[in-house]
Amino acid sequence: VITAPPPEGVEFDAAFAPVRRAVLAETVDRRRRRTRWTFGAVGSVAAVTALATVLVAGNVTGATDSVPLVGTEPQAASAAEVLRHAADETVRTSDPVVGPDQFLEVRIAEQSQAFLTQRYSALVPYSLTVYRPGDPGADWTLVRTSEDPVAFFPASEAAAAEAAWDAEPAGWPTGTIRAADGAFYDTPWTPAELASMPRDPDALYRWVSEHATGSASHEEAMTVLITDDLSTGMVPADLRSAMYRVLARIPGTAVTHDAVTLDGRRGIGIGRAEPNRDGEHSEVVIDPDTGDFIGTRTLTGAATGTLPAGTVIDSTAVSSTVVDSAP
């Protein structure tokens, strides 16, 4: 049992720094299963500190002018119709054909929040570019980049927050990694369950419901499981189609027209507001004409001390193409 009060001010910052560094190094490595945490599962000051640090994917505070909130409020009535249409279009779409001497290049760009001190944070852009070889025996390649912050928070104290960054930059891990089967972090990049997941929408709904755990609600857990798999850029068209139909059936699913991903592409946002997170709205963004998955967005629900309701606090863009070489 912990009886000592939590550290504050300078003492907190000193205790927080090594935890932040460790989690920053691990978070990108584990992005393929970003299970949402709740404070109900936290039982110590240390765990609360770790939790606050893990939420670097834009769940707490922050926004960026380069990812504007565009479009109408989510409308639940049309979500199922939009997703069914996207599923139909996806079935008509062929997966990229990668020759034996070529690579499937999948680029994931994101702006995510890194906490600098107990009070200050920064919105830090980074990217993960994966090269999957057409030759099954060849190594995969992962290229990681991290850039300087595009914003500091709170905005009213941006200069002080920037000084905290300058004192100890909290960028994401960078560099190039090569590994067989894309096992850059001990497990393959492509989720192992993709091959065995049912393609029948009813069977897939049951599968997702049985395997979804660890979020603020079961509905959120189901949404996160599907979103994480889609975010790898490795889900084949037939499974994407079934996943869209499953999303359409998750209670609370809504559609936001004219959503925007990080690289400026426009699509339809499909997601839900989580009541246990003050209405925070997380969504996948799809191209309604092709059924392609093009990114994700997270928007604030209730207004906070620094952010109005409906602010985009996290945005990703996922794109893929076939290339002739890897770095």
Predicted regions and their residues:
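N-terminal export/targeting signals for secretion/compartment entry
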Residues: 1-81
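Intrinsically disordered, low-complexity prosegments and terminal tails associated
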Residues: 38, 49-327
